[in-house]
Amino acid sequence: DQKYTLNKNSSIIEIDKNTFYNDLLMNVSYQSGTLNLGKEKDPFRSSIKIKLPHKISDTLELRQSFVGKIINGKISYINSKKSNSYIHASISSLGEYVISKDSLKPEIKPINFKSNSNIKLKNTLRLRLKDDLSGIKKYSSYFNGNWALFEYEPKSNMIFHNLSDGIIKNGENELIIKYE
């Protein structure tokens, strides 16, 4: 397979042969941390790999960093990988791309119960799991240190647990939700 590699001010764009359905004139620029591949036009047959240079030495900051697409002035998360000097992503449309950081914790909010409340008469427990930027990739839940099955409703960003499984005990119960 033939691959075209473009270098613009330390950024790298890798395009496989036959990525585009039609011939395309690309005006590529990389200035002030923004990779501009031009206006969105036709869809791609396959994705393009972009690599944006970084000088992030702090491991937490690097873990929180990702390639984002600028859409109407807002940054949209793109699943990204990190290497020593680049953050890279596969993209499926032209546009503007930057390195961004997701430093806000996801929101985990009980819906039908409160902390320190009696849940004995409940059939299910519902919680909202929400992350506005990078999303929640996976989660696990524990009652009193024991793994508990929570089902996920993606349309409402809710997880729920059927209490008929007998995992809760009389008195105080501890619920822990771990997420990535």
Regions from the language model: what does each represent?
Residues 22-71, 121:
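Proteolytic processing hotspots in large secreted/extracellular or virion-associated proteins
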Residues 72-81, 145-151:
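Surface-exposed loop/edge segments in extracytoplasmic proteins
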Residues 1, 86, 132-180:
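Long, low-complexity serine/threonine/glycine- and acidic-rich segments characteristic of extracellular
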Residues 16, 49-55, 124-132:
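Short edge beta-strand/loop segments characteristic of extracellular beta-sandwich folds
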Residues 2, 86-105:
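C-terminal beta-strand-rich structural cap/linker in extracellular carbohydrate-active enzymes
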Residues 98-118:
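Short, compositionally biased P/S/T/A/G/V-rich stretches that sit at domain boundaries
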Residues 92-96, 122, 170-174:
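Extracellular Ig-like/FN3 beta-sandwich strand-entry sites
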